């Protein structure tokens, strides 16, 4: 093969290589354009989806706002209802306490009169007039005590009971073999309670 032929062959190969390179470049450009087209399509689809979401959101947002408002109103109602119930219970309790205190003051003022009536009933006499008068006083005493008991007054138990400093007041110590140590042997003055409140402790003699 001559030098001329070799030169022609080399030129032909170079031309083929250039053609191949150009083809590769064209293919790459085409692929790039296709990829770009796909990306644009996806972007358009996403934009469309966003537009749909934006179109739906206002309605859903309004529903959510109304639901939130309803929940808040329900919570406020329940809180106010609970506060009102607590207020009613507190007022009722205060009224009961006030009634108890009012009755306590009245009954405390009456106790000395009851003591005097009971002392009068302990007086002995043979005169018929005296006995008749004493019987009338006794009836008044019983009626008064029953009325006070109906309103919560209670006589504190004493003789034979164990001494309780919450309701008893020890005035004298006793040494009586018929009673246990700490037992009350004698009541010196009656004590009274109004329900769970001590109006006046009983004055007692306690066995040592």
Swiss-Prot record:
Segments traversing the membrane: none
Keywords (A to Z) from UniProt: Chaperone, Cytoplasm, Stress response
Basic and acidic residues composition bias: residue spans: 1-12
One GO biological process term: protein folding
GO-annotated cellular components: cytoplasm
InterPro entries given in the database record: GrpE, GrpE_coiled_coil, GrpE_head
Region named Disordered: 1-49
CDD domains in the record: GrpE (cd00446)
Compartments (UniProt record): Cytoplasm
Keyword Cytoplasm recorded: yes
GO molecular function: adenyl-nucleotide exchange factor activity; protein homodimerization activity; protein-folding chaperone binding; unfolded protein binding
Biased composition annotated in UniProt, kind: Polar residues: 13-23
The family this protein is said to belong to: Belongs to the GrpE family.
Entry function: Participates actively in the response to hyperosmotic and heat shock by preventing the aggregation of stress-denatured proteins, in association with DnaK and GrpE. It is the nucleotide exchange factor for DnaK and may function as a thermosensor. Unfolded proteins bind initially to DnaJ; upon interaction with the DnaJ-bound protein, DnaK hydrolyzes its bound ATP, resulting in the formation of a stable complex. GrpE releases ADP from DnaK; ATP binding to DnaK triggers the release of the substrate protein, thus completing the reaction cycle.
Subunit structure: Homodimer.
Protein known as: Protein GrpE
Encoding gene, per UniProt annotation: grpE
């Amino acid at each position: 093969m001559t030098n001329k032929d070799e030169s022609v062959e080399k030129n032909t190969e170079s031309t083929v290589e250039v053609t191949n390179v150009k083809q590769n470049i064209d293919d790459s450009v085409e692929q790039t354009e296709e990829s770009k087209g796909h990306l644009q399509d996806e972007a358009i689809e996403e934009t469309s989806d966003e537009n749909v979401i934006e179109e739906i959101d206002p309605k859903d947002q309004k529903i959510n706002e109304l639901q939130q408002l309803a929940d808040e109103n329900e919570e406020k109602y329940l809180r106010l209802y609970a506060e009102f119930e607590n207020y009613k219970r507190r007022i009722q309790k205060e009224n009961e306490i006030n009634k108890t205190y009012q009755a306590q003051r009245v009954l405390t003022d009456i106790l000395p009169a009851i003591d005097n009536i009971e002392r009068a009933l302990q007086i002995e006499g043979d005169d018929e007039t005296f006995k008749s008068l004493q019987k009338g006083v006794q009836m008044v005493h019983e009626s008064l005590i029953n009325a006070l008991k109906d309103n919560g007054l209670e006589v504190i138990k004493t003789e034979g009971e164990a001494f309780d400093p919450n309701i008893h007041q020890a005035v004298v110590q006793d040494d009586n073999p018929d009673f246990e140590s700490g037992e009350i042997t004698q009541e010196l003055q009656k004590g009274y309670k109004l329900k769970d409140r001590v109006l006046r402790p009983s004055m007692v003699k306690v066995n040592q």
